[in-house]
């Protein structure tokens, strides 16, 4: 969501609240680890757990916990060799488990996923 996780966390909350108070569902993207645009479908992100949580996830966490975002769009990249949309750790353990996200989770357009695996891991 940006280069500065603290700033992004502070900015995303009022923006989501302003959108959603007008009966429109806000959707944040790209969850998670969308680190580059060029060849983004070929990226296999392998951050440490600390880096994941301190750099890449804070704004998404704020969007869920503080703003109650209704929509979340996944990213094109892989996470340790698995499409980020199909990652049990990202989707089931963190997003839905720890943060309690109950909104819509959708893929970006033309994401190459295994439908069964995606469904089994919360997409």
Name these PLM-found stretches.
Residues 1-123:
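Glycoside hydrolase catalytic-domain context in secreted enzymes
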């Amino acid at each position: 969501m940006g280069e500065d996780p603290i700033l992004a966390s502070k900015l995303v909350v009022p923006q989501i609240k302003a959108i959603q108070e007008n009966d429109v569902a806000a959707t944040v993207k790209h969850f998670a680890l969308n680190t580059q645009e060029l060849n983004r479908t070929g990226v296999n992100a392998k951050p440490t757990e600390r880096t994941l949580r301190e750099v890449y996830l804070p704004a998404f966490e704020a969007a869920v916990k503080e703003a109650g975002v209704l929509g979340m769009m996944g990213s094109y990249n892989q996470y340790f060799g698995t499409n980020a949309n199909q990652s049990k750790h990202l989707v089931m353990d963190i997003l839905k488990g720890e943060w309690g996200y109950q909104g819509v989770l959708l893929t970006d357009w033309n994401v190459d996923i295994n439908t069964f695996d995606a469904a089994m891991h919360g997409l």
